[in-house]
Amino acid sequence: MGLEKSFILFSLLVLVLGWVQPSLGRESSADKFKRQHMDTEGSSKSSPTYCNQMMKRRDMTNGSCKPVNTFVHEPLEDVQAICSQGQVTCKNGKSNCYKSSSTLHITDCRLKGSSKYPNCDYTTTDSQKQLIIACDGNPYVPVHLDDSV
């Protein structure tokens, strides 16, 4: 009887671990948004090499060069607040996008035409624009930067 209970408990443990394990170490959409788009310090954003450094540092040049990316130089709370501002339709047709009511300080990074992996070379453009972001989850948080206008 004791051996049977142990086997059942062991089987349940294996089942639970098999269910939980795949999500361990997987980056959430909210964490990916922060990694790819948030740079509150923006220490060298005015430098022409800012995008080259940040794209590499944030793992967006592993295996290929990400063609376009935007870094936001505002507090995370300000970006999260966009999720309760003006709702708009996302580029993919979904209805979970929101447009910031004011402009935010951003840096656009665009892959130069002649650039090829592994030598990813980006142009750096500093500007003030409104952001359109997709929000999801509970709590409702940014998960995708859809556009800047």
Curated annotation (Swiss-Prot):
Q: Give the source's domain of life in one word.
A: Eukaryota
Q: List the disulfide bonds.
A: 51-109, 65-120, 83-135, 90-97
Instruction: Give the reaction(s) catalysed.
Output: an [RNA] containing cytidine + H2O = an [RNA]-3'-cytidine-3'-phosphate + a 5'-hydroxy-ribonucleotide-3'-[RNA]; an [RNA] containing uridine + H2O = an [RNA]-3'-uridine-3'-phosphate + a 5'-hydroxy-ribonucleotide-3'-[RNA]
Q: Where is the signal peptide?
A: 1-25
What EC number(s) is this enzyme filed under? 4.6.1.18
An annotated GO cellular component of this protein is: extracellular region
Where does the record place the catalytic residues?
37, 144
What molecular functions are annotated in GO for this chain? lyase activity; nucleic acid binding; ribonuclease A activity
Entry's Gene Ontology BP terms: defense response to Gram-positive bacterium
Alphabetical list of SUPFAM superfamilies matching this protein: RNase A-like
Which CDD domains does the record associate with it? RNase_A_canonical
User: Metal-binding among the record's keywords?
Assistant: no
Protein family: Belongs to the pancreatic ribonuclease family.
What is said about its interaction partners and assembly?
Monomer.
Query: What job does this protein perform?
Result: Endonuclease that catalyzes the cleavage of RNA on the 3' side of pyrimidine nucleotides. Acts on single-stranded and double-stranded RNA.
Name the UniProt record assigns to this protein: Ribonuclease pancreatic alpha-type
